[in-house]
A protein has these predicted regions:
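Glycine-rich phosphate-binding loop and adjacent beta-alpha segment
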Residues: 114-177, 214
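A generic alpha-to-beta junction signature in SAM-dependent methyltransferases
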Residues: 33-35, 100, 125-126
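Mid-domain Rossmann-like dinucleotide-binding core that forms the NAD(H)/NADP(H) cofactor-binding site
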Residues: 10-91
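Glycine-centered, small-residue-biased loops immediately flanking beta-strands
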Residues: 39, 129-130, 208
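Glycine-rich phosphate/adenylate-binding loop and adjacent beta-alpha elements
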Residues: 1-6
Length: 214
């Protein structure tokens, strides 16, 4: 059990530290995606996970991060947290072309459980690009993928789930060092007596993370 415990700075609010676990999974996911300095990265979905991927890609030295997201509120949050541009899904191909000089993204990370996005992402990365299916998908989901796009363009397709102890340690250091702004992602705070109101706010267009504080 001791191996599951981590020491964090005492001055960090618990609501910020609560995001260390999903951030650890994001750290693991970007290890598969191999995000490197000067990369152009596409993040599909600007929920909490997408916003963590965005920030970590920036911290890793990505030259540009393009975010695709249908919610106007979450697109605004993505731009506040460092996205080069946050666009509606229908505009993502043009945005990637613009920021990559027509070559395609170096890496695309699917952060929302829409199976069709996996096939779309394959066509949005450059030859030799990387696509990571980070999101979980509904049971029985099927994604249509053009195998020739993978074969001839030598696209690397991976999945990612869970994290290692070292990823959790990295996540804590990133939060403690101020490299990942988890505080900005907690958009609503409720006291324990108002827990039902908090649950009702989850999923709202203007909500990213909702915290219940003692």
């Amino acid at each position: 059990m001791a191996g599951c415990l981590f020491v964090a700075r005492e001055d960090l609010p618990s609501e910020q530290l609560a995001l260390a676990e999903p951030l650890a999974a994001v750290v693991a996911g970007q290890r598969w995606s191999r995000v490197e300095p000067d990369d152009v990265v596409l993040v599909m979905g600007a929920g909490p996970i997408g916003l963590l991927h965005l920030q970590l890609a920036r911290h890793s030295g990505a030259r540009a991060v393009v975010v695709s997201e249908p919610s106007a509120g979450r697109r605004a949050a993505a731009e506040q947290l460092g996205a080069s541009v946050a666009v509606e899904p229908g505009d993502v191909a043009a945005a990637v072309e613009d920021h990559s000089g027509g070559v395609g993204a170096d890496a695309a990370i699917v952060c929302i459980g829409v199976p069709g996005l996996v096939g779309e992402a394959i066509h949005l990365v450059r030859p030799g690009g990387r696509v990571n299916a980070f999101a979980g998908f509904p049971a029985g989901s099927v994604a249509e993928i053009d195998p020739n796009a993978v074969h001839y363009r030598q696209v690397v397709l991976t999945g990612s789930a869970n994290s290692r102890r070292r990823d959790y340690e990295t996540a804590l250091r990133l939060i403690e060092g101020g490299h990942i702004d988890t505080a900005a992602m907690v958009t609503h705070r409720f006291g324990l007596p108002d827990v039902l109101d908090a649950l009702g706010k989850v999923g709202a267009d203007d909500a990213i993370k909702v915290a219940v504080l003692p």
